[in-house]
């Protein structure tokens, strides 16, 4: 399907979630396949984190394991050739080299029920409007260190926005990474 879409002139990006049983060699093989064989425009990656509604709780990554896995992945010889769809500082955060707080409102999710609170993974209710989501959600209650359900989270929906803000504020810092 990806090759067909590319043949038809579509830009293709793939999203993948990495879980506990994956090792850096397998991840590198997948990224090489996406970049070299499929020639996708980019890969969006995120660590699998044990949010409570997930049906399989035993294959998720802890923060410690996430950092080690991404350090090992980015140490691979081909790492600089892979096309990721995320900021370099977010990728550096995944490897444990940046300390960020979650920005749960940075990637709001909406479905037929409304705007999800506080993020699509926790889904602790819905707001009827974006204004209601922003003004009636107590954002300080969420994020790693503030809420036990967020303890191991390093997911893009909360941390990419923080990394992008850091990139805008410190562009030279972002250029130093990778």
Could you tell me what each predicted segment is?
Residues 115-178:
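Flexible mid-to-C-terminal extensions adjoining Fe-S/redox cofactors in radical SAM and related proteins
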Residues 1-107, 112, 117, 121, ...:
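Radical SAM enzyme [4Fe-4S]-AdoMet core and its adjacent flexible, acidic
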